[in-house]
């Protein structure tokens, strides 16, 4: 039933195991043995401190990494949020376009130029971005391209509207170098202007052949989520590596196009350098989802800590099971964390030499010296320390027992009983088990004290406590709560069962005479009150004790030496 078993009698050992061992082996052997044990435990403690220090070092590495990762994530999240905002605006514009004359004129202009090899529609260069497009013939040649869409006019006006938002969202302080909307219907809007109309087809097909566009087909991106892509420079090209975050634009289960933002790797490198604490060692490295190196916080040695294939395999294996962690690689410790708003990993590489020069290296050296000093002092002063510890242990055990028990009856005292009762009542309430309380008060105890003296009264209390303890179940708890008053806690017992236990206590107390003086015996009795949580559903121990106490006094008024389990009988 999950009820804690409580022992009602506590044995006091006369001698500790150290004294028994000393009697058998002699003080010298005991001292030597204790010295070995303490030395062993001091070594284990030092080892434990080393483990804690290592954990603190790992936590420090992770905290430094987390601070930089959070700062980078914050900026990336800002750009992702802008992208989602632009997509929502695009969807609204597709469903309910603005009824402006300039937008209607733009649709008319599109119909006039849609057959041209390249065309451009511009409303106001100072307020919005132009829409650049290619001919119907060129669109028909693309696998993913199509103008067979009833909402094509709405998409044209929506592109002009989102061009206004793109112009507002793009600024020089942003990490984003270019923001664009690329449509499957053969046109695009970009914050990077197309100076010559003849360059529109080349630029458009450069967009629609990129992975960040193709990867948003309904087959490749079924969840229509934000995705990140990395472009690496080719040997014959001066194109700077960059990452692109993009999201598909859909409406009524139709894929219109892709909204994207391109971030140069050099911008992310500059941000890493600004985000890290200049007083801290270690190098930060950014990798994409395929663990391809993107950039490092160390511009002087950009390839100094790049991992070999075996180390990359170890990292990939560790990243399969968690979003953050750390791993030791030879003399380096690598902590890593997946970014929330970028499909990649930020790693921090800390070498052994950097660790030794740091605070944790100094602490490790100091800890070793302290262990050596402690061992030397232990060798000189062990005998005195052993005696102090032994005496303090005996004193502590004695004080603890006295704090929880009544020394006369060897039962729990009032404070300890209340401490035991509350968790037992809560446990019974949790499992919907009954919880009962018995209050016991010895009859005419004051008369025994007055007639035979307090020494006889103490014998009566000790005798009664022993009989009460022997009448209880294993899980019951008994304590002395007053002069001649006892309380019994019965977890799991209903009112009927508690009344049976109370009757058993009453009979045991009353059926045996006890010798209190030479040729003088007396028979004692007690009045008992019983209460249970099943009566009112109340598991409050103090309330149940008060109810049992009231019934105890009803038993007193009814003639004593009886059990009252209700207010009527």
Swiss-Prot record:
Pathway: Glycan metabolism; bacterial cellulose biosynthesis; Purine metabolism; 3',5'-cyclic di-GMP biosynthesis
Cysteine disulfide partners in this protein: none
Organism: Shigella flexneri
Residues flagged as site, Transition state stabilizer: 446
Keyword rRNA-binding among UniProt keywords: no
The entry's keywords: Cell inner membrane, Cell membrane, Cellulose biosynthesis, GTP-binding, Magnesium, Membrane, Metal-binding, Nucleotide-binding, Transferase, Transmembrane, Transmembrane helix
Residues binding substrate: 449, 454, 458
Name recorded for this polypeptide: Putative diguanylate cyclase DgcQ
Domain GGDEF span(s) in chain numbering: 433-568
Residues reported to bind Mg(2+): 441, 484
Biological processes annotated in GO: cell adhesion involved in single-species biofilm formation; cellulose biosynthetic process; negative regulation of bacterial-type flagellum-dependent cell motility
SUPFAM superfamilies, per the entry: Nucleotide cyclase
Annotated GO CC locations: plasma membrane
Cofactor: Mg(2+)
TM regions (residue ranges): 25-45, 365-385
Catalyzed chemical reaction(s): 2 GTP = 3',3'-c-di-GMP + 2 diphosphate
Class in the EC hierarchy, top level: transferase
Subunit structure: Homodimer.
Principal location class: membrane
Active site: 484 (proton acceptor)
Function: Catalyzes the synthesis of cyclic-di-GMP (c-di-GMP) via the condensation of 2 GTP molecules. Cyclic-di-GMP is a second messenger which controls cell surface-associated traits in bacteria. Involved in the regulation of cellulose production.
Enzyme Commission numbers on file: 2.7.7.65
Compartments it resides in: Cell inner membrane
Pfam families (alphabetical): CHASE7 (PF17151), GGDEF (PF00990)
Membrane association type: Multi-pass membrane protein
Gene: dgcQ
Cited InterPro entries: CHASE7 (IPR033416), Diguanylate_Cyclase (IPR050469), GGDEF_dom (IPR000160), Nucleotide_cyclase (IPR029787), Rev_trsase/Diguanyl_cyclase (IPR043128)
């Amino acid at each position: 039933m999950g009820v804690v078993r409580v022992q009602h009698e506590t044995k006091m050992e006369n001698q500790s195991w150290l004294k028994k061992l000393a009697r058998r082996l002699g003080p010298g052997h005991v001292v030597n043995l204790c010295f070995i044990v303490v030395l062993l435990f001091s070594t284990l403690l030092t080892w434990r401190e080393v483990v804690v220090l290592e954990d603190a070092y790992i936590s420090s590495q992770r905290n430094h990494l987390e601070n930089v990762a959070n700062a980078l994530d914050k900026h990336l999240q800002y750009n992702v949020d802008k992208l989602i905002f632009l997509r929502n605006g695009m969807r609204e514009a597709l469903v309910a376009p603005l009824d402006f004359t300039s937008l209607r004129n733009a649709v008319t202009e599109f119909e006039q130029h849609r057959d041209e090899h390249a065309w451009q529609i511009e409303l106001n260069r100072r307020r919005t971005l132009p829409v650049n497009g290619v001919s119907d013939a060129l669109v028909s040649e693309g696998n993913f391209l199509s103008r067979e869409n009833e909402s094509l006019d709405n998409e044209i006006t929506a592109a002009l509207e989102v061009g206004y938002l793109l112009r507002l969202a793009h600024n020089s302080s942003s990490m984003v170098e270019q923001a664009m909307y690329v449509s499957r219907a053969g046109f695009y809007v970009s914050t990077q202007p197309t100076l010559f109309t003849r360059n529109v087809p080349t630029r458009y097909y450069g967009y629609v052949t990129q992975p960040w566009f193709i990867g948003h087909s309904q087959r490749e991106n079924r969840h229509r989520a934000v995705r990140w892509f990395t472009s690496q420079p080719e040997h014959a090209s001066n194109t700077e590596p960059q990452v692109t975050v993009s999201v598909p634009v859909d409406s009524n289960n139709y894929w219109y196009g892709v909204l994207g933002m391109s971030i140069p790797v050099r911008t992310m490198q500059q941000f890493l350098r600004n985000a890290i604490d200049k007083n801290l060692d270690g190098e930060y490295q950014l990798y994409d989802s395929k663990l391809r190196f993107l950039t490092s916080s160390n511009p002087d040695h950009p390839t100094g800590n790049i991992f070999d294939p075996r180390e990359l395999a170890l990292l990939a294996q560790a990243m399969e099971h968690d979003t953050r962690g750390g791993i030791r690689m030879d003399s380096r410790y690598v902590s890593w964390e997946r970014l929330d708003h970028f499909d990649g990993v930020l790693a921090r590489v800390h070498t052994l030499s950097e660790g030794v020069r740091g605070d944790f290296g100094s602490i490790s050296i100091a800890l070793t010296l302290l262990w050596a000093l402690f061992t030397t002092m232990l060798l000189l002063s062990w005998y005195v320390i052993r005696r102090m510890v032994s005496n303090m242990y005996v004193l502590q055990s004695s004080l603890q027992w006295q704090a929880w028990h009544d020394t006369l009856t060897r039962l729990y005292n009032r404070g300890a009983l209340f401490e035991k009762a509350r968790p037992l009542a809560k446990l019974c309430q949790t499992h919907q088990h009954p919880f009962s309380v018995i209050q016991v008060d010895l009859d005419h105890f004051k008369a025994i004290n007055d007639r035979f003296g307090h020494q006889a009264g103490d014998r009566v209390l000790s005798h009664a406590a022993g009989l009460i303890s022997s009448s209880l179940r294993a899980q019951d708890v008994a304590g002395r709560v007053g002069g001649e008053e006892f309380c019994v806690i019965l977890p799991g017992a209903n009112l009927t069962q508690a009344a049976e236990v109370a009757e058993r206590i009453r009979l045991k107390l009353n059926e045996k005479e006890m010798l209190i003086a030479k040729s003088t015996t007396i028979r004692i009795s007690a009045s008992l009150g019983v209460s249970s949580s099943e009566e009112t559903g109340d598991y409050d121990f103090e309330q149940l004790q008060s109810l049992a106490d009231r019934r105890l006094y009803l038993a007193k008024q009814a003639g004593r030496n009886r059990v009252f389990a209700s207010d009527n009988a």
